[in-house]
Amino acid sequence: MSDNRSRRIAKELADVQQDKQAGIQVWTINDDISHLKGMFRGPEGTPYEGGYFVVDIEIPIDYPFRPPKMNFDTKIYHPNVSSQTGAICLDILKDQWSPVYTMKSALISLQSLLCTPEPSNPQDAQVAQVYLQNYQQFVRTAREWTSSYAAAPAGVDLDAENTEFGGIDPNIITNLQQFGFSTELIVRVLQREHIKSQEDLKDYPNGINGILDQLLH
């Protein structure tokens, strides 16, 4: 893996960790920064509201000049997502990709796609047909799937105020856990470094990378 590619991915991960407002989480799988998972909540006012949607992310060797490969791990009833495989039809993940895009911007685009499906360019033709011909049935089924398949993962709440760990933002703890560190170690280091909020983390030298250095030593 090239140093430039590695640095780019590491920077994107750090940016996601520090951006609390985006409501996006990204973490590595088995410490492999070419294979990640992303997660976001279903948008309010849609059949996906209240759901937590996990996306598998594979980073190509020539990233960011080629788009990441993204598939929904969470089953979702949507015209632009295969109900069988989770494959996604979204232009910026194909021919409209640009190196200025990031994993975060791609995940935000996926979240926006849940607000504005494009049934004229479907990934799942059967779902698109229901969307166009019987919209109320589409909404009912999408809500049922959200309820059945998109429950919050254990221990994850993107909005929660933490009281258990001395007021430390739970998103910080959850994000650091994805790097394989124990909760006990994370809390101990964050308390020692006086990190409770995303703002504290932003002001910390080197941000999330600075905390990762502390956890490794």
Swiss-Prot record:
Residues 4-151 form the UBC core domain. The keyword Nucleus applies. It is found in: Cytoplasm; Nucleus. The keyword Signal does not apply. It comes from the Eukaryota. InterPro entries: Ub_conjugating_enzyme (IPR050113), UBA_C_fun (IPR015368), UBQ-conjugat_E2_core (IPR000608), UBQ-conjugating_AS (IPR023313), UBQ-conjugating_enzyme/RWD (IPR016135). Its main location: cytoplasm. PROSITE patterns: UBC_1, UBC_2. Pathway: Protein modification; protein ubiquitination. GO terms for biological process: ERAD pathway; protein polyubiquitination. It catalyses: S-ubiquitinyl-[E1 ubiquitin-activating enzyme]-L-cysteine + [E2 ubiquitin-conjugating enzyme]-L-cysteine = [E1 ubiquitin-activating enzyme]-L-cysteine + S-ubiquitinyl-[E2 ubiquitin-conjugating enzyme]-L-cysteine. CDD domains: UBCc_UBE2K (cd23800). The active site is at C89 (glycyl thioester intermediate). GO terms for molecular function: ATP binding; ubiquitin conjugating enzyme activity. Keywords: ATP-binding, Cytoplasm, Nucleotide-binding, Nucleus, Transferase, Ubl conjugation pathway. Belongs to the ubiquitin-conjugating enzyme family. Catalyzes the covalent attachment of ubiquitin to other proteins. Functions in degradation of misfolded or regulated proteins localized in the endoplasmic reticulum (ER) lumen or membrane via the ubiquitin-proteasome system. Cognate E2 conjugating enzyme for the HRD1 ubiquitin ligase complex, which is part of the ERAD-L and ERAD-M pathways responsible for the rapid degradation of soluble lumenal and membrane proteins with misfolded lumenal domains (ERAD-L), or ER-membrane proteins with misfolded transmembrane domains (ERAD-M). This is Ubiquitin-conjugating enzyme E2 1. It comes from Schizosaccharomyces pombe (strain 972 / ATCC 24843) (Fission yeast).
